[in-house]
């Protein structure tokens, strides 16, 4: 759902997906990108992503286990076989899980041309994430105000306390 709302040409781009889960975003654009790097803290899903990439012969994709609560962000650069900045960094619905999320947003600004960012957490958390994006990036464009990779978040029958605990996430392109 999220990738379809983007107007980004991924042809020959170097792409990083932070919090890549099982690699779905990168698998969907692997035929276009020059190189894709996915990182996530869960070694089991990274192992799965690597099995899929190997089976499908996606030689332009790599997946690594990185715990951004304990590892320095610069470790990501060590995994990339590219010397330049990333053209695009995906940072989708992960900030509420990272203690130093504000520093991570600053790191993305220094290491990419475009950041595709999805807010997550309670409304106040999402507001803080947006404020940080606006502080760090020159342009923050709202792409979708009900972004989700799970139809649960898009259901109209979710109201009251359930909606409060599962607020709609917002998708931004930051430059």
Question: Language-model features: where?
Answer:
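Conserved alpha-helix/loop element of class I SAM-dependent methyltransferases that forms part
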Residues: 1-12
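Conserved class I S-adenosyl-L-methionine
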Residues: 13-21
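Conserved SAM-binding loop of SAM-dependent methyltransferases across substrates and taxa
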Residues: 22-33
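Conserved SAM/SAH-binding beta-strand->alpha-helix loop
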Residues: 42
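Conserved SAM-binding loop
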Residues: 49-50
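Conserved SAM-binding strand-loop segment of SAM-dependent methyltransferases
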Residues: 58-69
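A short SAM/SAH-binding and catalytic strip from SAM-dependent methyltransferases
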Residues: 87-100
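Conserved beta-strand signature within the Rossmann-like core of class I S-adenosyl-L-methionine
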Residues: 112-123
């Amino acid at each position: 759902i999220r990738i379809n709302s983007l107007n980004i040409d991924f042809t020959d781009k170097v792409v990083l997906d932070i919090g890549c889960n099982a690699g779905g975003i990168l698998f969907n654009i692997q035929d276009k990108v020059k190189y894709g790097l996915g990182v996530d803290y869960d070694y089991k899903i990274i192992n799965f992503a690597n099995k899929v990439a190997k089976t499908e012969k996606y030689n332009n994709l790599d997946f690594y286990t990185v715990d951004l609560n304990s590892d320095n962000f610069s470790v990501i650069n060590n995994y990339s076989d590219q010397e330049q900045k990333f053209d695009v960094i995906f940072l989708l619905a992960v900030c509420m899980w990272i203690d130093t999320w504000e520093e991570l947003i600053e790191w993305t600004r220094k290491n990419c041309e475009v950041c595709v960012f999805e807010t997550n957490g309670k409304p106040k958390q999402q507001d803080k994430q947006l404020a940080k994006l606006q502080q760090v990036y020159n342009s923050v464009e709202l792409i979708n105000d009900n972004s989700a990779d799970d139809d649960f978040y898009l259901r109209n029958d979710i109201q009251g306390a359930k909606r409060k605990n599962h607020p709609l996430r917002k998708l931004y392109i930051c430059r």
